[in-house]
UniProtKB/Swiss-Prot annotation:
The lineage of its organism: Bacteria, Bacillati, Bacillota, Bacilli, Lactobacillales. GO terms for biological process: DNA-templated transcription. DNA-dependent RNA polymerase catalyzes the transcription of DNA into RNA using the four ribonucleoside triphosphates as substrates. Residues 1175-1199 are annotated as: Disordered. CDD domains: RNA_pol_B_RPB2. Its EC number is 2.7.7.6. NCBIfam families: PRK00405.1, rpoB. This is DNA-directed RNA polymerase subunit beta. HAMAP family: RNApol_bact_RpoB (MF_01321). The RNAP catalytic core consists of 2 alpha, 1 beta, 1 beta' and 1 omega subunit. When a sigma factor is associated with the core the holoenzyme is formed, which can initiate transcription. It comes from Lacticaseibacillus paracasei (strain ATCC 334 / BCRC 17002 / CCUG 31169 / CIP 107868 / KCTC 3260 / NRRL B-441). GO terms for molecular function: DNA binding; DNA-directed RNA polymerase activity; ribonucleoside binding. Keywords: DNA-directed RNA polymerase, Nucleotidyltransferase, Transcription, Transferase.
Amino acid sequence: MAGHLVNYGKHRTRRSYARIKEVLDLPNLIEIQTNSYQWFLDEGLKEMFDDIMPIDDFQGKLSLEFVGYQLLEPKYTVEEARQHDANYSAPLHVTLRLTNHETGEIKSQDVFFGDFPLMTKQGTFIINGAERVIVSQLVRSPGVYFHSETDKNSRVTYGTTVIPNRGAWLEYETDAKDIAYVRIDRTRKIPLTELVRALGFGSDQDIINMFGDNDSLMLTLEKDVHKNTDDSRTDEALKDIYERLRPGEPKTADSSRSLLYARFFDPKRYDLASVGRYKVNKKLSLKTRLLNQVLAETLADPDTGEVIAQKGTKVDRQVMDKLAPYLDRDDFKTITYQPSDQGVVTDPIELQSIKVYSQVTPDKEINLIGNGHIGKKVKHIVPADVLASMNYFLNLQEGLGSIDDIDHLGNRRIRSVGELLQNQFRIGLSRMERVVRERMSIQDTATVTPQQLINIRPVVASIKEFFGSSQLSQFMDQTNPLGELTHKRRLSALGPGGLTRDRAGYEVRDVHYTHYGRMCPIETPEGPNIGLINSLASYAVVNPYGFIETPYRRVSWDTHKVTDKIDYLTADEEDNYIVAQANSPLNDDGSFVDETVLARHKDNNIEISPDKVDYMDVSPKQVVAVATACIPFLENDDSNRALMGANMQRQAVPLVNPHAPLVGTGMEYKAAHDSGTAVLANNAGTVEYVDAKQIRVRREDGALDAYNLMKFKRSNAGKNYNQRPIVTIGDHVDVDEIIADGPAMQNGELALGQNPIIAFMTWNMYNYEDAIVLSERLVKDDVYTSIHIEEYESEARDTKLGPEEVTREIPNVGEEALKDLDEFGVVRVGAEVRDGDILVGKVTPKGVTELSAEERLLHAIFGEKAREVRDTSLRVPHGGGGIIQDVKIFTREAGDELSPGVNMMVRVYITQKRKIQVGDKMAGRHGNKGTVSVVVPEEDMPYLPDGTPVDICLSPMGVPSRMNIGQVLELHLGMAARNLGIHVATPVFDGANDKDLWATVKEAGMASDGKSVLYDGRTGEPFENRVSVGIMYYMKLSHMVDDKIHARSIGPYSLVTQQPLGGKAQFGGQRFGEMEVWALEAYGAAYTLQEILTYKSDDVVGRVKTYEAIVKGEPIPKPGVPESFRVLVKELQALGLDMKVLGADKKEIELRDMDDDEDDIVSVDALAKFAAQQEEKKAHEAAAQATDGKSANSTDDKK
């Protein structure tokens, strides 16, 4: 027997073909959300308050300090929040201390800071009753970046950017003449040396002493001449910089000093964040920069004088290991520079400096200047950073240092929920700070309390804005559990502070070698967002700095054996190592079998001897995301089709009776477990009671846990969200075990589709171009039947003319239409409704006339319907018919919170049972998608030799050109699994190979080619060739024909052009575009074309007259002028062109005469004419009433 048995949960055993030992369990798949939010509650919030507080007033009399905060119990449970359209949130209370420095009085007070949305256990938020997900964002990390460009004359220019988390950008660049410039905050450039002078190093000699006689520096000093000799060099530089930053304002050295200080060295205005400080220190420290350089001086121990490294030594790893402890010391090779008193910062600056030889001219000595030892707590930039980064920049021309790749995942980091929330909260708090300062100066200092100073409005508003309308706060994709899980693990490069679709080039979207094990190279949307929206790889985790780490098995450096010690590496750490592939064959003791090993180093794939290998992959599936890891035989599919397969699994509709795949990958259990749709046991114990709605588990400590299941709830996508117990009374359950399946799950595994018998053969041309031929059995036995629940709402509001009323008494409606309404006019649960049926009877007052006193009295006594009302009932929309599943009524009397002006709200849920039908979209897991073209009676389908009819026929032409051969392998293995009565697991890149597949086929007693003779169901004759028949997992996707099919009868028209609207949602028409008009012109179908462009479109009068003619059975009159032509004429007239329309007799045609449009009449005679028309009209009306209300004339109809 090929393969071995593996248990997935307690309810499923699969035969696994994996050969590679599982060294590491997958992490919790939604921890990127939950951990980040937990960090925010534990630390992030406090950090924010500590940043903003204490707040002092302008005179320094009062100060407001932060003491602590607490979140109280949430007002609603998760379920109640869903029902009430409310937020699942908890009140945030902050303790503040107000100190009066004049009197020494201290007041402490608890201040309510608004309701703060809480994250559910599943990693989502409930905002206004809907589940939302905050997508993590991929952004450039703050830090120092160096880049180079080659111009058309092959000259290399260099550039540097210092990117903060917030604050001004600092950029250095060289031009074609090698002069170095600096830009502050994207303004005009000034010579680099001016910034050095402004920092307090005024003379040329000071600058040369610090940086050495670099060519570019010398050229820059020549350009930077002393223009105004009255000022010192430092003052002149300061004024120059001020002029660039604030052009047009009077410049003084003092104002420039304070401006520069505020731009870069003020922690309130400039923030690198902890990650920025970490990146800057890492880039500028001598530890990283000395590696592979040749020393131009001898380095000795400062205490003993013992030589550590001789002059001329090349610093390799061994030398660096000796040097590292010294480089961490404050007294090793440290030079202190004292800026002049005129500089921006006057404190002494400590730099670490070591001489090395140039890579370009080998005997030239170069200063390497590091930024010293700046603590993690310093979140702003300091002069040492500026000088060290300038030194790095100048040294690039000498071949020292490296250029940064912006798409490298060491330079891109993830902002998860916690950080995004923190940034939003900071915005709210800083707005609040301004208000507090103003109030401090206004209020009486003796009596003021913290409560009076605080205005929480800006804080509440910024949080509400973030959850309600941020690009990263998204309505959760709840089609099935995999869609949910993937949405929470999504990484987006879009959003505030990120890229925009149109600006993102090819490089950003492309797969980068650092994606390996961190981001999935396959799962990304097709279309404009390709490569900008990615998915976290299955084993990847996010470290505290926001960089993605992936696990590797450590290879012992002395024995060269692979150990089970796991290290998580970021992308830039991994660049230092050589990593072997997960499928490298190992001996039992962990040593490599082969003489050479396939390995990766940076972006190279290399063959190398085992003693050079540092790490080894933990698993072959660490490269891909969860959805991709659910595709069996992924290694045999072309990547484009695998991309479609991964994306389409998320669109699979949960079926009534789901089945887990016969051929799985072993990922199904973990995906279902972590998605949050299943019910997990919180504690171990024994099941005491089970029914469809509740499971009760007796814990080991004697307490009882009750788990309520969700039954037939509507998911965000309008699908049926239903949970079913999979345990029975007496079962023992463990902590975290699945005790109830969610939607699209079976026995604790993901079950997105079914396992039908599929034949690759054409059938009467019905499966041409990816069409699918289905057997009627799939319809009859409800194999692909799904339940859909739609929610409809009706509100009774107060209007100016009186309140709307929910009632059975609806004007002009027969008893037949009211048969399913109760006494209040609300439809009963269980009623079957069709399109156009009334769900909630509602009338709105028309209020034509004001009631007289007598009428009001009569109305008060007898409650007579003296008032005119309009029927504004809620009706079933087109295609919305089904069975009423639930009705919820919310009223003020019952204590429900309703929006202002609403007296009552009724919510009706309609359930539809949709069987598979022609037009529905289906797909396998390999990107093999199609639409159903015909449903064939079971007896007409081709059948196997044992008489079993095939369920689906797919076109064999869909395979070769698309190169997704995985589907064929799955087909054969699926058939073998069915015959053997087993489920199999074939993990990605480590699944069943050729030998395993054919061994299993043989074991199942199938033919050696895996094919079968098929017989035509209509004639009973065998087909000429043997056909590939087997079991393939096939899903029904949420693109169903019922949601798309649409036809217009009489519907709304666009306001300006008077043409019918478009689209199903607007009940619109089909667009007859320019090319369709050409087609009719080519056929000479003049009359057809004329009516399409007039009656059926925007000839307003013609429409009405045509309708009238059809009703009366008269011939249809000639069409008039289309409204859009009038719009064109009016637009030309508006441009001042005297546009007139002439008839065939060259006489002007008055457009308004043609269609009786009174609105355009301005002149006095025209008004007189209008009055005469009105008189005539009244006479007509009287005559019409006399002849027993025959149809009114067309102008009146139009009115």
